[in-house]
Amino acid sequence: MAGAKVVVYGLSTEGYALASQMAIKGADVYIIDESTPSAISLKAEIAKTYPNVSSLKEDEPLLAMEPIDVAVSKAQYLFFTPRIRKTGQDVKTEIHSKFKDAITSLKKNSSVIFTLPTGFGGNNENISLLEHVTGLQAGKNISYFYYPLEDLNQQPKIIGSFNGKEDLVLSDLLTTNKKEKKFVGISSSEHFHAIDILSRFSGLCSILEVCKYAQDEITKKDLSSSNFQEIFLDNMINGLFDLKSLGSSFEGSNSLMYLINGSVKGIDGYMKRLIDEIRGTLKKNDLK
């Protein structure tokens, strides 16, 4: 694995965390900030000095660079981890545009790792675009993997692979705490991720919806003293994009859409109640 040539497309929180992890493992890593024309060399000592992307941007250390197309053309592994700024229907267009830019200079026998959530069938579209742009054939002279990064503190246990083919070097790059990754088919990985997301949000929203009916102080106090007090805003926000991406897989009404829409509405409702409570507290205490 040592010396594997890796390019991470996107100086996002997730992208930098992955790049740092692999640089510390000894990979030859370049990370691409989409707002600049160059790929930045990320060495192990830099990754150890700057634990997150915010600290790197604040200090602005002098780092070696090379043109993006040169870095990508030499990459054995290209991780797609862009910053997404659009919302609603424009998200898919933005992702496809950036993905096309990222893969244009890829060469034969390289591998693409897609880290954004796609919902059901989204990876088939990505693979078609990959083959069209590069002129290469997935599973034959270029590889495609699906690794949705919903939570950096708990990376996926499985890697979706075209035809379920294993890649031991990639597994080593992504393995943390000696927990080896399992390779499954692309469609299987989409389903596993959907189950994880829906299970988490269904449980979370059940708690939020039930607790909102607690009116008296005794009940509120008892509920606050339980494990429910360990729920933070990050727990609600992380994975929300994954949930909405899953929802975009369907047209019309079905049981899964009820679960998805109910979870989204539950989170929105909690946010509104939280804002109202904060405003009420500020007003009550004459604070601004």
Go through each PLM region and give its residues.
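Structural/interface elements that position substrates and couple domains in central-metabolism enzymes
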Residues: A2-K288
